[in-house]
Amino acid sequence: MPKRILEGVVVSDKGDKTVVVKVERTIVHPVLKKIVRQSKKYHAHDEANAYKAGEAIRIIECAPKSKLKTWEVLPKASA
């Protein structure tokens, strides 16, 4: 099964080698038929402490690195 890749915004970089990423998605409410925005926070491994709060990043699934971290940050694409 392929690993999932999500895009989000860093909301916290206070942990050592850890960032908290907020991922937003839109769904259609099953009863109201209205488009609703949902968000979820993921703890992701950032080996180099390279990302700061407010940056848009991509994360990929990985083997568990700790109790909360099962995602790691994809490296920045070089232009």
Curated annotation (Swiss-Prot):
Any one GO cellular component localisation term in the record: cytosolic small ribosomal subunit
InterPro entries linked to this entry: NA-bd_OB-fold, Ribosomal_uS17, Ribosomal_uS17_bact/chlr
GO biological process, any: translation
Coiled coil: none
Domain of life where this protein originates: Bacteria
Key words of the record: Ribonucleoprotein, Ribosomal protein, RNA-binding, rRNA-binding
Gene Ontology molecular functions: rRNA binding; structural constituent of ribosome
Assembly behavior: Part of the 30S ribosomal subunit.
Purpose of the protein: One of the primary rRNA binding proteins, it binds specifically to the 5'-end of 16S ribosomal RNA.
Family: Belongs to the universal ribosomal protein uS17 family.
Record-linked PANTHER family: 40S RIBOSOMAL PROTEIN S11 FAMILY MEMBER, SMALL RIBOSOMAL SUBUNIT PROTEIN US17M
Full protein name: Small ribosomal subunit protein uS17
